[in-house]
Design a protein with these regions (language model features):
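Hydrophobic alpha-helical segments
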Residues: 1-98
Length: 98
């Protein structure tokens, strides 16, 4: 099934992952894919990908001193965007197979 909003989602994805920011595009792409994430960020990024509703203030606070507000925000948004894309693709594939 074709996603009528694919071009908009792709533009959003490119801007968030490759646009200007405090974190590197490589770090944002890694968070979006949940691959090659720095070890200290891995638990948070994995949690966002698998069970985002369980992320706590403490999860973020542990990394705040190292990464700061802007970089943390960018990593969290990138991870959430990557997780949402995986779910969208799975849903569209399920509709295609139905």
């Amino acid at each position: 099934m074709d996603d009528p909003h694919a071009s908009l989602f792709d533009a959003l994805f490119r801007q968030v992952l490759d646009g200007p920011g405090e974190s590197t595009p490589e770090a944002r792409r890694a968070a979006a894919r949940n691959l090659d994430v720095p070890p200290d960020l891995q638990p948070l990024v994995a949690k966002i990908h698998k069970h985002a509703y369980t992320v706590t203030d403490q999860d973020v606070a542990r990394l705040q001193a190292t990464y700061g507000d802007d970089r943390m925000f960018e990593i969290i948004v990138s991870a959430a965007l990557g997780a949402s894309r995986k779910r969208l693709m799975a849903g569209l594939a399920a509709l295609e197979d139905a």
